[in-house]
């Protein structure tokens, strides 16, 4: 065994071995328990960042741990390779997205291999290949045939820069999440999948996700947004027209003083035809930001239509207003407004001088709406002559009474509604899977026939940044169906389509069908899924929805796609900038910043770059290109080795919290690995060891062996159950301190160290696999570490012969005594009283009280 640790040499040899022996390729094996470990696949942007490294290291640690448990472990990888960044890069370079994407895949694949991740590369997929999206297209046509797909014109969030539709979740502070362009509203026809048909099941099944973080589950419950209310009909005065309103607070119905409708409501458009001010306001609303954050903070504005609605119970006439806070694509596009009991309605009524009528009050006092609305569920009063029986009722009784009356009169009904909207899957971009629908000359819309699938996206195109090549190329859109001319759909799928079922395709990536059900049902559901919490309400919801679609198509037999979910935190790094002569901030890499001065709390006071510019330190922030504070993983691997980078990633922070990148921490991880190498090297150099005989161990040897097996127990629990990888590493480091100080004088000393090194090598194998692979062989094992088993805890070794008891006199520690592990309270008390240090502090005092905490503490109170 070479004396010095050489990571580049070791890692290259081990990676070559894994590749040549196809170590991580697996097939279905009914005789073994399976374990499917999956990290969210990357977008091939060009280079891995530290966020990728953290995600994939966590996944690899879990997968390797489960392999040593004897399980048949699948850990695949692939590429989420459609999307806007490739298009934008192609536009900038006047080329096609395809070569840019495939070059990035090749580069990043090599980076993943350098980090030693144990992937089954035989299952690699790229979502931009026809072999993949063919089956997505096929499945979409089947959903269409089942009535799960429809096309309609709708108001959408539109990014003028990227020329594409954005989901509400993709609009941040009124701007596009990708390019920060202000978002406008636009009416376009697009395709939808009826996720709302599964809203109830998606909501109820959240309760079965025992292995998912509570935060993710809460976010999904809120996003699905189930509510129970009443949908009622309001008639328009002097008209045959009527419109529906849904409310979850029917108890406030008798306090309605106006009705607000969306700018896109048919009544609004009708009224605008003779009202120029209203028409202008409607145009203003169409271009407004409709995200929740914007709606919550924007000024509430409206214009009266001149129309009046008839209250469904009292018959009272109330004005109809168009308001910017009502959306046509949410609910019915109309809301009953009760300013006395809704703060938004209150502010609007105050602004426009509208009537307020209180009809709910606290049970034990009068209601005051002089300064704000009373929004609690109190007791009804002031209900009027049309329904005086409501007075005195509380919320649920009032709900039931109003429901009964409206139902009996045919004016309303109880209803469950969801905040969740159907999934708009159309995108007006090129680099995506073509939507497999055609339109015949007579206007008939139909799925592309199965024998014409896949509808292949042409890759040999040039992006001009003005129009999608498949929209510009009329010849591409022209096709025939049964000899009749037809035109292809030129929209492409939302890329969330590809990422919603990739996990299932890994089970049979080369099958000439969407899924091989036998293989899919062997591997699914995923046992461990790993990815960022930012995906909670988009990918992770679509992921669950798609699995239920696959189930109902008979392709899988489980209800949920993943048993356990770990959401890793972000990676942060120091951020520095200076202001140039034009007043612009220039961000400087932390690798180029020299800290000149720190305050007494260790905070940076002064720093400069290599050019002498004095830098402003802004603290730790998420690694990003915009702040130039990303650390290239490849640079760190070349400097310290992959195992060191992996160890730091696992040790620096609990997995679900943010990780602060500190190169000093990386150096510390590197020193630890070198210490372990040196300990093993010295042990091997001393020659073979004899068998360990636990019956001959001294008390100190027993104590060391106890520490070893306590560590095995803790690391097993930390990795396998708690997933607290940082504390697992800390436990091994603490054990290493004991091993480094242990004498190596006798044969049993060396035999004990041999047992410890064998265990430590396997305990660390999931985290530092290259070194562990090498040490395993150097320690004399003939098999490969991947084929070994996780170390077992020797329960007998954990039994202590004696205990160290702390003795206090009047709250101060005065002695530490060693007692038999099974010593009685009386025996411990006597030993404590007999101790010379204790006697010294009891001189002249009488012991009044004795407190004994078994195995830990003896406390004497004396005066």
UniProtKB/Swiss-Prot annotation:
Family matches, as Pfam families: Anticodon_1 (PF08264), tRNA-synt_1 (PF00133), tRNA-synt_1_2 (PF13603), tRNA-synt_1g (PF09334)
InterPro entries the record matches: aa-tRNA-synth_I_CS, aa-tRNA-synth_Ia, Leu-tRNA-ligase, Leu_tRNA-synth_edit, M/V/L/I-tRNA-synth_anticd-bd, Methionyl/Leucyl_tRNA_Synth, Rossmann-like_a/b/a_fold, tRNAsynth_Ia_anticodon-bd
Chain positions of motif 'KMSKS' region: 622-626
Keywords of the record: Aminoacyl-tRNA synthetase, ATP-binding, Cytoplasm, Ligase, Nucleotide-binding, Protein biosynthesis
EC number: 6.1.1.4
The keyword Cell membrane is annotated on this UniProt entry: no
One GO molecular-function entry: ATP binding
Top EC class of this enzyme: ligase
GO CC annotations, alphabetized: cytosol
Domain of life: Bacteria
GO annotation terms (biological process): leucyl-tRNA aminoacylation
Catalytic reactions of this protein: tRNA(Leu) + L-leucine + ATP = L-leucyl-tRNA(Leu) + AMP + diphosphate
SUPFAM superfamilies with a match to the protein in the record: Anticodon-binding domain of a subclass of class I aminoacyl-tRNA synthetases, Nucleotidylyl transferase, ValRS/IleRS/LeuRS editing domain
Binding residue positions for ATP: 625
Motif placement: 'HIGH' region: 42-52
Record localization: Cytoplasm
Family matches, as HAMAP family: Leu_tRNA_synth_B (MF_00049_B)
Family: Belongs to the class-I aminoacyl-tRNA synthetase family.
Protein's recorded name: Leucine--tRNA ligase
Species: Shewanella denitrificans (strain OS217 / ATCC BAA-1090 / DSM 15013)
């Amino acid at each position: 065994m070479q004396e010095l640790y050489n990571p580049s040499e070791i890692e290259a040899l081990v990676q070559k071995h894994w590749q040549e022996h196809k170590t991580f390729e697996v097939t279905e094996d009914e005789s073994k328990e399976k374990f499917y470990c999956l990290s969210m696949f990357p977008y091939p942007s060009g280079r891995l960042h530290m966020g990728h490294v953290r995600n994939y290291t966590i996944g690899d640690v879990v997968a390797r741990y489960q392999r040593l448990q004897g399980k048949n472990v699948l850990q695949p990888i692939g590429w989420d390779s459609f999307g806007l960044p490739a298009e934008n890069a192609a536009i900038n370079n006047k080329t096609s997205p395809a070569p840019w994407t495939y070059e990035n895949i090749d580069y990043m694949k090599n980076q993943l291999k350098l980090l030693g991740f144990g992937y089954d590369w035989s299952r690699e997929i790229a979502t931009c290949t026809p072999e993949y999206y063919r089956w997505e297209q096929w499945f979409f046509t089947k959903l269409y045939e089942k009535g799960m797909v429809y096309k309609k014109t709708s108001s959408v969030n539109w990014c003028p820069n990227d020329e594409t539709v954005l989901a509400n979740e993709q609009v941040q502070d009124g701007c596009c999440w990708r390019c920060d362009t202000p978002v406008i509203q636009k009416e376009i026809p697009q395709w939808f999948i009826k996720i709302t048909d599964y809203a109830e099941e998606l909501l109820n099944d959240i309760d079965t996700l025992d292995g998912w973080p509570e935060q993710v589950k809460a976010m999904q419950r809120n996003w699905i947004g189930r509510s129970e209310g009443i949908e009622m009909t309001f008639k328009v005065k002097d008209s045959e027209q009527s419109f529906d309103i849904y409310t979850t607070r029917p108890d406030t119905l008798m306090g309605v003083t106006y009705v607000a409708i969306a700018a896109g409501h048919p009544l609004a458009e009708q009224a605008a035809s003779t009202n120029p001010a209203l028409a202008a306001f409607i145009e203003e609303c169409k271009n407004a930001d409709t995200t929740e954050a914007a709606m919550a903070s924007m000024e509430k504005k409206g214009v009266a239509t001149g129309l009046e609605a008839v209250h469904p119970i009292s018959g009272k006439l109330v004005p109809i207003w168009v308001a910017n806070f009502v959306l046509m694509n949410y609910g019915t596009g109309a809301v009953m407004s009760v300013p006395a009991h809704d703060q938004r309605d209150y502010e609007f009524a105050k602004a426009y001088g509208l009537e307020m009528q209180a009809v709910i009050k606290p049970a034990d006092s009068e209601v005051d709406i002089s300064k704000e609305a009373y929004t609690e569920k109190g007791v009804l009063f002031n209900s009027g002559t049309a329904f005086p029986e409501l007075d005195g009722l509380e919320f649920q009784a009032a709900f039931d009474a109003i429901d009964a009356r409206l139902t009996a009169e045919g004016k309303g009904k109880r209803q469950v509604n969801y905040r969740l909207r159907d999934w708009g899957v159309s995108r007006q971009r090129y680099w995506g899977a073509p939507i497999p629908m055609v339109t015949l000359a007579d206007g008939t819309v139909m799925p592309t026939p199965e024998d014409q699938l896949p509808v292949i996206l042409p890759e040999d195109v040039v992006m001009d940044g003005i129009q999608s090549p498949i929209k510009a190329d009329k010849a591409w859109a022209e096709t025939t169906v049964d000899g009749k001319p037809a035109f292809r759909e030129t929209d492409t799928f939302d890329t969330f389509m590809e990422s919603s079922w990739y996990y299932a395709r890994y089970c049979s990536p080369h099958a000439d069908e969407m899924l091989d059900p036998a293989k899919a049902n062997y591997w699914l559901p995923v046992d461990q899924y790993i990815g960022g919490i930012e995906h909670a309400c988009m990918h992770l919801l679509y992921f669950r929805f798609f699995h239920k679609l696959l189930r109902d198509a008979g392709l899988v037999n489980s209800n949920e796609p993943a048993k356990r979910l770990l959401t890793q935190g972000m990676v942060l790094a120091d951020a520095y900038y200076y202001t140039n002569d034009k007043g612009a901030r220039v961000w400087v890499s932390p690798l180029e910043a020299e800290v000149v001065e720190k305050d007494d709390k260790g905070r940076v006071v002064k720093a400069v770059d290599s050019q002498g510019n004095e830098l402003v330190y802004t603290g730790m922030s998420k690694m990003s290109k915009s702040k130039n504070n990303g650390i290239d993983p490849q640079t760190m691997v070349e400097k310290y080795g992959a195992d060191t980078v992996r160890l730091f990633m696992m040790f620096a922070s609990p997995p679900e919290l943010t990780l602060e990148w500190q190169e000093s921490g990386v150096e510390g991880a590197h020193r630890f690995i070198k210490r372990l190498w040196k300990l093993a090297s010295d042990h091997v150099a001393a020659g073979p060891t004899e068998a360990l005989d636990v019956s001959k161990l001294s008390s100190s040897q027993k104590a060391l062996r106890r520490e070893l097996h306590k560590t095995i127990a803790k690391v097993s629990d930390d990795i396998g159950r708690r997933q607290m990888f940082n504390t697992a590493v800390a436990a091994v480091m603490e054990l290493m301190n004991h091993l480094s100080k242990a004498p190596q004088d006798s044969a049993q000393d060396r035999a004990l160290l041999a047992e410890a090194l064998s265990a430590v090598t396997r305990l660390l194998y999931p985290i530092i696999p290259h070194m562990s692979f090498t040490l395993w062989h150097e320690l004399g094992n003939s098999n490969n570490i991947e084929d070994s088993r996780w170390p077992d805890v020797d329960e007998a070794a954990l039994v202590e012969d004696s205990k160290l008891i702390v003795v206090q006199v009047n709250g101060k520690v005065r002695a530490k005594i060693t007692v038999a592990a099974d010593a009685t309270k009386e025996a411990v008390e006597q030993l404590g009283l007999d101790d010379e240090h204790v006697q010294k502090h009891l001189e002249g005092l009488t012991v009044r009280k004795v407190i004994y905490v078994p195995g830990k503490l003896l406390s004497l109170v004396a005066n």
